[in-house]
Amino acid sequence: MTGGKSGGKASGSKNAQSRSSKAGLAFPVGRVHRLLRKGNYAQRVGAGAPVYLAAVLEYLAAEILELAGNAARDNKKTRIIPRHLQLAIRNDEELNKLLGHVTIAQGGVLPNIHQNLLPKKTPKSGKGPGSQEL
């Protein structure tokens, strides 16, 4: 039966398995492959490239979400908001380098007070009238 609505699948494939599940990923390998082909990055795209790229993207997303979840927990919140993403990215040296020129809407800025603006610390010496030294 040629030209039917088989969708290009091999005949007799009982349990079809996605490339994402084969690779053990949550990110869609098929969609990444399609975007690599349509993006005019190269004439041809190898079979391993979208799997690798999907794995890298999944790792980066998991890393950012873990740090943002920690920031939300530090602020006693149960929901991650853009402020938590901003704090997570800017406090991590490598993520800040990677996403240095990225603006996060509603992210705010990192809290920072210059040392010259902080109140002076007065040294408290133990040499007073109540000193017990001999």
UniProtKB/Swiss-Prot annotation:
Positions of post-translational N5-methylglutamine modification: 106
Compositional bias annotation for Gly residues: 1-10
Pfam families registered for this protein in UniProt: Histone, Histone_H2A_C
GO CC annotations, alphabetized: nucleosome; nucleus
CDD domains reported for this sequence: HFD_H2A (cd00074)
Residue numbers bearing the Phosphoserine modification: 131
Region feature (Disordered): 1-24, 115-134
Signal peptide: none
Keyword tRNA-binding carried by entry: no
Residues with the N6-acetyllysine modification: 5, 9
UniProt keyword terms in alphabetical order: Acetylation, Chromosome, DNA damage, DNA repair, DNA-binding, Methylation, Nucleosome core, Nucleus, Phosphoprotein
Swiss-Prot/TrEMBL domain comment: The [ST]-Q motif constitutes a recognition sequence for kinases from the PI3/PI4-kinase family.
Extra remark beyond the main annotation: In contrast to vertebrates and insects, its C-terminus is not monoubiquitinated.
Protein name as annotated: Histone H2A
